[in-house]
Design a protein with these regions (language model features):
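Hydrophobic transmembrane alpha-helices and their membrane-interface boundaries in multi-pass
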Residues: 27-106, 113-119
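Central hydrophobic cores of alpha-helical transmembrane segments
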Residues: 129-136
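Glycan-recognition and catalytic regions of carbohydrate-active enzymes
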Residues: 15
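Select subsegments of transmembrane alpha-helices in polytopic membrane proteins
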Residues: 18-25
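Short, Lys/Arg-rich, polar N-terminal cytosolic tail immediately upstream
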Residues: 1-12
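Short helix-perturbing small/polar motifs within transmembrane alpha-helices
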Residues: 118-129
């Protein structure tokens, strides 16, 4: 890091890995929830193929997050262009995962989880990203 970097950039560099890991853990928790619903018979709409699709999506998220992280903080220098792209990727994955869960689980209470992901996105202190999240 250079001496002239702002405190927000330093904060974003330190929290990026944390936020990406929390996003991935949250997606894995949703997979565990879907599997539990299928095994216990709580939700009859959850199929084995849906579980496989959800698992594949989460593996892809992990790969994409890893690529974004390496691209953003690689070479011991914070790449702002890559960071902005990573925020866009996070926003896309947030809504894609929400829609995927909505299709798989057929639950009326799924809308509540979107606020959790918006709050995680707010850790980047990016008003534009949070505003877009709320509008979508």
């Amino acid at each position: 890091m250079k001496n002239g970097e702002s405190s927000i950039i330093k904060f974003n560099q330190k929290t990026l890995k944390f936020v990406l890991i929390i996003y991935l853990v949250s997606c894995i928790a949703s997979l565990i929830n879907a599997i539990t619903m299928k095994v216990t018979g709580i939700n009859d709409y959850v199929t084995t193929s849906a579980i496989v699709i959800l698992t594949a999506a989460i593996v892809i998220y992990g790969i994409v997050f890893r690529i974004c992280y390496v691209w953003t903080v690689g070479k011991n220098e914070f790449n702002m262009k890559a960071f902005n792209a990573t925020k866009g990727v996070i926003l896309f994955i947030t809504y894609f995962h929400y829609i995927l869960l909505d299709v798989i689980l057929h639950s009326d209470s799924q809308w509540m989880i979107i606020f959790y992901f918006i709050i995680l996105g707010a850790l980047f202190f990016d008003l534009k990203m949070v505003s877009i999240s709320m509008v979508l």
